[in-house]
Amino acid sequence: MIIEWVPYNNLQNIEYLTKGGISEIYTAVWIDGRYEEWDSKEQKLIRYGRQEVILKGLENVENANQRWFEEAESHLKISNKWPQIVQCFGLTQNPSNGNYMLVIDRADIDLRKYLQETQNQLSWKERIKIAHDITLALSIIHSESAIHRDLHSGNILYSKLNQRWYISDLGFCGPADKLTDSIYGNLPYIAPEVISGKNTTKKADIYSIGMLMWEISSGQPPFSYYENDYNLALNIINGMRPKVISGTPLKYENLMKQCWDADPSNRPDIDTLFDGIYSLLQYYQNISNEILQQETNNNLENNKIINNSMSKHINSTLFTSKIHKFKNLPEPKNAIEGMSRKFSKVFKKLNIKSNNDIQINYGKEIVEQQQIRQYNFNIDDEDETYDYKNFHSEEDNVFEIPDGKII
């Protein structure tokens, strides 16, 4: 695929669409369209013809360093090499203000809007297919030794023609001149170690996938009612995660929790995650349509209740990629680590003498959950949970359909 310069006068019907993060986004018609095929007789490339495209502004490119340009070029090549990534055809420049813009293939809808419009009609088979397409696309990005850095439901795009989900915005996340002591992204999807100031790695992308998996299950963005970025950042670092939606398949839940573990080394790599999602999709594809329809009907009312309760609280300003700058944040941890310290203080205050062997081997989880119910450590049971380590045995991971029901 050729990355080309698109003359601005070759674009028509340019209309403002929205503001995506710090970039203004427009729709347009590219008169000539992309290169489609090679005409061996005429010995020239044949163009597609009139084509709808997206124009995305690039901020402060003139101040970018050489590394930014090298990374941008590499990611452009990746996006045009693999069909699972939204294609970027090239660059153009608005002559009225001198701003550079990406010329990108246009999709039909993003994941956030799609879920909000269709959640009550989606079966688990359809939801897992979404997760499958996303993890497949990310596996390709990681195989090219690249990192996305800003995965969220606004840049997961759907093509009705191809019936496939794509990842977009690869390599152009944030301003070119972003300060080194700041981070850029959509806060609910940013990994805790990145929030606390560490470098972004592939495992940070995996954390974002965990948040997307939860959004696919619930139909709503995570932490949708938070008003304060700093409070949300601190809670994420301290182990707060969204509450698992009732009816979520156990295998899916386990993978999701592994993805959002506070310790990056505990998260699966993308190949392991993709294999898990793929096996789950295969399982659901072998289930009869009758059982799938029963499962969809059973979840319909539950999803309506979830969506109605969550939609009242959505803070649209939170779900925008932007620059964040947090100082003096603690090291990320899973909530069980922080809770254990709180419980030890409670035991001392109540003069509770516990047998360590009993606590470790017989009832640790039960004791801790009882203490959580008795003492309110700023946990809202209706909206978020301080996520515990996965206590399921290996036997729990086996797929079963007891009494014709899907779990």
Provide a role label for each language-model segment.
Residues 87-100:
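Short beta-strand micro-motifs within the conserved protein kinase catalytic domain, predominantly
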Residues 24-59:
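Glycine-rich ATP phosphate-binding loop
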Residues 154-188:
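Activation segment/activation loop of eukaryotic-type protein kinase catalytic domains
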Residues 142-159:
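Catalytic-loop of the protein kinase fold
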Residues 97-110:
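Conserved short submotifs of the Hanks-type protein kinase catalytic core
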Residues 243-246, 260-272:
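A conserved short helix/loop substructure at the end of the activation segment
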Residues 117-129:
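Activation segment of protein kinase catalytic domains, centered on the conserved DFG
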Residues 205:
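Conserved catalytic-loop aspartate of Hanks-type protein kinases
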